[in-house]
Amino acid sequence: MALVTLRRNLYHLSDFRIHGALAALKTQQVNHVHKTVKEHLCPWFWSQHPGPIRVRFHHAHCKKFHSENGNDLHPVGEPGFSQVHNWDRFEHSVKNVDEQMFYRKLNSFTSSGEILRFVSTLETLPDTMMAGALHRICEVERKDGDQRLPKEILESSAFQALCDRFGRDPSDLSNAGLVTAFQALTLLCGDPQSHLLMNLEAECQHRLERGGLDVHSLCILGETLIKLHGPGCSTLDLIIYQLQGESLETFTPEDIVTVYRLLQASPEKADQQQRFLNKINHFSLSLVSNLSPKLMSQMLTALVVLDQTQALPLVIKLSKYVVRHIARFTSEELRKVLEALIYFGHSDRFFTETLEQHVASLCLTLDPELVSRVMEYCSRKLILSEPIFNAVAETFVCQAEKFSPSQTAKLIEPFGKLNYLPPNASALFRKLENMLLTRFNHFPPKTLLRLLHSCSLIESHPVNFMAKIFSPYFLQQLQGAESYLDRLSLAQLTQLFLTSILECPFYKGPKLLPKFQVKSFLTPCSSLETPMDFHLYKSVMIGLIDLLGARLYFSSKVLTPYCYTIDVEIKLDEDGFVLPFTIDEDVHKRVALCIDGPKRFCLNSKHLLGKEATKQRHLRLLGYQVVQIPYYEIEMLKSRLELVDYLQGKLFSQNSGGHW
């Protein structure tokens, strides 16, 4: 193993920052260069805990350790060392350094200056330890978000001494030391034309072409080249080719996730690598229980980017383990998990219950982007979770200024879609109105229209903004560069206009011009009306024929002059007798049967969606007698006779005055 001699007269350095590192030494076994001489070690170098010392640093000798969020770098189950600044006492060569203790001490530092001062007290170190020190600098500095080290640090003698050995003779370096140093210096320096990086890259390329790199080194090299040259780097194909030839049993969980990230860098090539992906997807099922929250999030993200819809068993298993560790996810990681579950269309009761507890416990500290993603997840899956909705409403009322226009829309829209008013509804919509009054022009036109339309679904009518959205100026903005307005926007405008007539008679502002009004609210995306459940309709139709005597006495899928489509319409004369549907004279009352299948309700509930509740409310205001026939009542009927009795009770109760 190559030893690196360091100059000991290094300058003291101030803290500095970089953008984060990606991975570290994992697979190559590193032997101690010399035995530890315990009696010569400084007292503070020893653990205060009995048992073997385990170091939470990505290093070949310490395979059980990983940094789960980039900030949590203490050994598993043990507290981190307190900071000690008596650096002059540590004047020993590597023969007095126990490797595990070296990494334990290294991981206790929180700034680059401390790391460099610590390493400067050592006369010689193995190349893997030196590379580990560089990597640790990446770990401690990436939390501040800067992408590069300051110039004064890069040019300092301390940093140059640390880098000098790697550039002088890279051929003497171990594989693990080489690729880890290359990775760390790429992140710290970032200049592809750097003489040092060019030397290290050339040596990596040489060993790659000889087939001399192990799995973990290939993974680190691949991610480093993507960082340095972008996903179009030609060498990446050779790395993936060599990884395909390795047995998956030799891959660690971190390696598997890194392979996903390598493939994710070129999603357009996913079809070419599908056989390899299928193998990885299947093998990953056995690794899920060993993944950290960070790795789970990264794996799910890669599955989305690579469009691995056939890997649903893996997605389901990952979601089960997310439930167990949800409190350990960062906001960004949990957001990625939710995006993946939305993409694959997966949800389950246990995840929802755990998410409810998590969101409720963090009510006023939730990240705005995470809040909007949680609400989008509930909206897409039609999950009406009162604990989540109440917590989110409270968060918005207290911290509305933190939410962007798009985040605000994603937060509010599910309340209308799922037909739910939180306990603090008045405060919620007052806060929203104030935001719109002050930031109206910051909302994109379509986002604003969706937001206001959602409010109207739960009878929080945006009267103060109707004049603006019906104005020619707004309609022109809404259309943008297109030659016409899309059908969904026109339908939303039309329903808002109908709402202004039926529910806001005091509104006296501009009307929506006829050319912007649709004839039917049925749209391809079913955003304003849900099509009738055909199988449920067939059952009800049989019962109606038995009850009324003939198919002649009711019509189905009737488009009204008010844009709504009625599932079944029955006409009654003044005496309450049923008329044939072909007769339009002497019609005294129209009965609208709403045959509500499961898709018209929130998931696993009897709570109507906002669009369906609005439709029934409007039909009543238009003079229809609305009769709801929900699927869960039909499913309880055991015979045709029970169905007829049920329909008779619904249609011709004592108060309805109807006859047949």
Curated annotation (Swiss-Prot):
> Is Transit peptide there in the keyword field?
yes
Task: Give disulfide pairs as residue numbers.
Answer: none
Task: List residues traversing the bilayer.
Answer: none
Return the GO cellular component terms, semicolon-separated.
mitochondrial matrix; mitochondrion; ribonucleoprotein granule
Alphabetically list the UniProt keywords: Mitochondrion, Transit peptide
Major localisation: mitochondrion
The UniProt similarity line reads: Belongs to the FAST kinase family.
Q: What is this protein called?
A: FAST kinase domain-containing protein 3, mitochondrial
